[in-house]
Amino acid sequence: MKDRKIPLSLGKTCPVKCSFCYEKDHSYRTTFDVPLTTQEDWEFILKEIQSHPTGAESWVVGGNEYMEWTDLFLHPRAMDWLKEFLETTDKNIILFTVGYTPADEINQLADKYPGRINFELSVITLGAYRKRLMPHAPTVDQVMRILDGPAVTSANFYSLGPDTMSVDAKKISQINKKCLLWMGCLTPLKYIDSETTALMRQGKKFLARESRKIYEADLPNTTMIQTESDITAFLNRNKIIKTFDSCELEKKDTVVMAGNVYKVMNLLRRNRARYLYVPNHMLGGDSNCSTLLTFGDVGRRLTNQRRVYLPKVILEGASGEEKDISGASFEEFQSQFPRCTFKVLHKVNSDLSNKKLYEKGYLKNYVEDYLGNPLHKKFEAITLPN
């Protein structure tokens, strides 16, 4: 709770069973069997929340630092407790759900407490693929009724093929012209089934086409593309180059990086240092992001290096501790390689990736500065080492 995450629990695994869910595999990290949150538990949680000073930051329902995205609005008391939170505190709250909030209730709360609810609605898709991906999710009608009101701050949905993301964007914008449209592709990881993986990859092939259609539609909503690490890296290439230049690395220095940053550096700073490309082996699939690298991933790529520079973002997998997303500690990792000295690039951190790198994540930037820039073809042509 020190990170303002409200620890509710369904007391069981999420029953929604979305085929794309990143919670299908827990082997890479420690999990906790937390019982169903009771009224007594909630009273304790609420008192703890009330004891914290109110700041600009929001409290969160619907996820934790271990990437658990169980839909907590399936808890039978979730809406009652949300109301009590809003009534008895002056704090703001962020909600994550695929649409299990009663439409009238959540929109009435947004009217009653303007500016205090940041509702991030996971639409995923409104089209023909919805039943395959989300067999137990709320109906399209339920999702649209939630959207038809002031509650939803942002709606995320994805390209799954021709006339998917673009059609959804127009549908949502017709009934809600204010919510942010958060788009892109779903990323297949190694434990996602083959049929869903193929659908995700089909979506990526059509992302450019779908994005251009939305760009040409000139919707009143803010539109963003935020799931594609390669695109994000390319759009922020100047910031990435500037950050690495400021680290004052020598040409002989070995620097760990995921594929997206590796491609930027090889395109624009080929001989700045020795770039050690590290695949996201732990998560596998098409994952290609420094934030999701683990120490195990790095260890697999080390040979006889004596000094290696690590981006700090790898060490920020757990709040306030030097651990990766799997829970492995930096100290433990270092002990496995006694002949190698590890240095941390403190400027390459989660603050950079979560804030600065998202500044150019608008769909307009993708269409104009990525698709419209001939340099992106050279970027895409760069091959990653085996």
Each PLM stretch: what is its role?
Residues T222-N386:
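Radical SAM enzyme core and accessory elements
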Residues S9-H26, G284-C289, P311-G317:
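Local cysteine-cluster metal-coordination motifs and their immediate loop/turn environment
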Residues E57-W59, I117-N118, P138-M224:
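Conserved C-terminal portion of the radical SAM core fold
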Residues L86-I93, G115, L147-S154, S173-L181, ...:
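Structural alpha-beta junctions
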Residues K2-L10:
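Immediate flanking context of iron-sulfur cluster ligation sites
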Residues T37-K47, L74-K83, H136-I146, T164-I172, ...:
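Well-ordered, non-membrane alpha-helical segments in soluble/globular domains
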Residues P102-I106, K263-N266:
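Short, well-ordered alpha-helical microsegments
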Residues K5, D25-I45, I49-A103, P114-V143, ...:
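Core AdoMet radical
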